[in-house]
């Protein structure tokens, strides 16, 4: 249910679709421009360069007049010319293998100096192809089968690109679950909620990435087939020649992308939860993803810095630990990690971060049994935000079946007090205690089942979801038995239940939020400016609905500047005077408006 809501939010966000289109375009670039496969391209380029150099310096003498070195050069030139003139891949492969084998002899004897590692990788590639009986060598991106397209597309794109979907999903879903949002108010253990958010980010990020890869993958599959699992790949890794297959690389790359996405998701959610800063986690994850591109973290730096080797950087540039078809790299960022160790390091970090998440979301145990009396009670408290304390409260008690009003000018701290009472903002209460029916607000999941705050802003509503979807989520999350149809009919919101809330007027949104509060079945409702933006008829409808809930035994605390309506609804009031909360009982000799004017000397 919770994950379903988050995935709906992702699916309906335009940024997600834009990101997917950008990914699809970026991964399709090699095919669109028919980029050469650098292995065969550089093999032929190297051979052609050798032939040109040989022809320039070749002596006119022949046969026995040539020195052994000149004879070797002539033999190399013959193999190179044969490879360059080959009409089939099999003929090219046969001549190329002989060319690189002779080059290898020259390296061993010392008669040839240069890039031996690349020559060794090219020779291993040719021999592996010959021994496997595979003679098809892709020359350009349009020749790649499905199995080879994924690694090549990942290699051709910037290393951070495949992980953008996970970063974007993290930002969107952490924003959708920040304090005061509907998802944040849902009663659930904090660690379970953390896991659900992480899972939703992984699912959304993976779906975006696969959708971005789909056009190129489908094109490669349709044009060149699935490919051969045993197609050889050769490259130097950590100073040693490594040979593997296209099937192994494909699997490792997929696992690395998933491991990297999981690491981003967990890091983003845990750090944002621990710091209570929505963007702290995604920012840290973005730095990790971008790190392989930093000069400081180059292969030479990693080779001399044990601390940097402990970072899970290789998983964010997996192609450099796996190689890919036709490419013979000899240097790597994170060269100390092979495919298996790269994945292992990433998963260790995931496990550690989950452990940190379990610690930071742990709720303290209730100190002794819950008190037997009923009511919402804030005692001996100071309330504030940031580094500022704005209210001192001796006692605020809301007993079952009562309605109380909160009255004060703008800027006095009404919203801060209501947020403190909701339990959703634990840092709002600097000292003192808050409990509902004896359940401390520190027991966040149990407390959320009892107390619901309907905020004055738009945080309660998601613009892309309909009113009905909000109400359905509320009913399921709070395990409510509320009759949604009857509730909507009584408030007059049935005609626009299927509209996205961004298309509703301010008054309509107010009524939807009131319906959501009622639908929770929470015994204590805290309503911040629930009557703002309503015409007289709708105000009466909303007041009747609140009065009906009080008659059913629910308690309501209402903040409003509409004093006449507030006076009709409530039988006690709380005023904020000079930073202190003062309770005043309803008087028959003085109206609430007169009381307000006397208290604030002409203030609102």
Across the structure, where does each feature detected by a protein language model lie?
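Secretory targeting signals
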Residues: 31-39, 135-171, 198-269, 273
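Terminal transmembrane helical anchor/hairpin motif
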Residues: 36-49, 135-144, 225-248, 282, ...
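The feature captures the beta-strand-to-loop junction immediately N-terminal to the Walker
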Residues: 407-409
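Helix-to-loop junction immediately C-terminal to a conserved catalytic motif
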Residues: 422
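Conserved ABC transporter NBD signature motif
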Residues: 430-447, 583
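Q-loop/switch helix immediately C-terminal to the Walker
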Residues: 453, 463-477
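Conserved ABC ATPase "signature" region
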Residues: 472, 481-497
């Amino acid at each position: 249910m919770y994950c379903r809501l988050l995935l709906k939010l992702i699916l309906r966000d335009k940024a997600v679709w834009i990101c997917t289109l950008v990914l699809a375009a970026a991964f399709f670039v090699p095919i669109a421009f028919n980029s050469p496969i650098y292995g065969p391209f550089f093999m032929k380029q190297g051979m052609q360069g050798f032939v040109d150099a040989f022809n320039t310096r070749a002596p006119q003498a022949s046969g026995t007049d040539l020195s052994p070195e000149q004879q070797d050069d002539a033999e190399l030139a013959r193999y190179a010319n044969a490879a360059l003139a080959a009409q089939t891949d099999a003929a090219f492969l046969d001549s190329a293998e002989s060319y690189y084998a002779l080059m290898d002899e020259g390296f061993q004897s010392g008669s040839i100096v240069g890039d031996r590692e690349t020559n060794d990788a090219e020779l291993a590639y040719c021999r592996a192809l010959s021994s496997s009986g595979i003679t098809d060598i892709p020359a350009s991106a349009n020749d790649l089968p499905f199995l080879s397209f994924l690694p090549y597309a990942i290699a051709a794109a910037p290393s951070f690109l495949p992980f953008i979907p996970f970063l974007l999903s993290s930002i969107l879903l952490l924003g959708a679950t920040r304090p005061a949002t509907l998802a944040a108010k849902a009663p659930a253990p904090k660690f379970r909620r953390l896991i659900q958010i992480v899972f939703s980010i992984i699912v959304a990020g993976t779906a975006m990435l696969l959708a971005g890869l789909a056009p190129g993958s489908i094109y490669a599959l349709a044009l060149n087939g699935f490919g051969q699992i045993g197609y050889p790949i050769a490259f130097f890794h950590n100073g040693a020649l490594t040979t593997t297959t296209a099937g192994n690389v494909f699997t490792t790359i997929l696992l690395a992308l998933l491991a990297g996405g999981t690491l981003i998701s967990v890091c983003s959610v845990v750090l944002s939860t621990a710091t209570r800063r929505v963007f702290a986690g995604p920012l840290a994850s973005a730095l990790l993803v971008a790190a392989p591109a930093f000069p400081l973290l180059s292969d030479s730096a990693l080779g001399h810095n044990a601390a940097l080797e402990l970072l899970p950087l290789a998983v964010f540039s997996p192609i450099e630990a796996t190689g890919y078809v036709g490419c013979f790299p000899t240097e790597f960022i994170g060269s100390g990690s092979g495919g298996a160790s790269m994945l292992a390091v990433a998963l260790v970090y995931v496990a550690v971060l989950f452990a940190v998440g379990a610690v930071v979301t742990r709720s303290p145990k209730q100190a002794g049994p819950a008190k037997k009396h009923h009511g919402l009670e804030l005692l001996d408290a100071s309330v504030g935000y940031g580094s500022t304390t704005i209210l001192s409260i001796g006692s605020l008690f809301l007993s079952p079946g009562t309605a109380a009003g909160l009255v004060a000018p703008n800027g006095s701290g009404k919203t801060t007090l209501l947020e403190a009472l909701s339990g959703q903002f634990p840092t709002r209460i600097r000292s003192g205690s808050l409990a509902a029916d004896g359940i401390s607000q520190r027991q966040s999941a149990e407390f959320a089942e009892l107390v619901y705050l309907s905020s004055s802003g738009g945080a309660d509503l998601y613009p892309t979801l309909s009113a009905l979807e909000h109400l359905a989520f509320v009913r399921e999350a709070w395990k409510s038995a509320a009759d949604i149809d009857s509730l909507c009919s009584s408030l007059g919101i049935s005609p626009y239940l299927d509209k996205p809330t961004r298309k509703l007027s301010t008054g309509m949104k107010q009524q939807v939020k009131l319906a959501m509060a009622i639908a929770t079945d929470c015994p204590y409702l805290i309503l911040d400016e629930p009557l703002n933006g309503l015409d007289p008829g709708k105000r009466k409808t909303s007041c009747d609905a609140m009065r009906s809930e009080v008659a059913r035994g629910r308690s309501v605390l209402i903040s409003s500047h509409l004093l006449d309506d507030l006076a009709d609804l409530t039988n006690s009031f709380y005023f904020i005077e000079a930073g202190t909360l003062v309770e005043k009982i309803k008087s028959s000799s003085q109206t609430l408006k007169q009381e307000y004017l006397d208290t604030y000397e002409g203030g609102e």
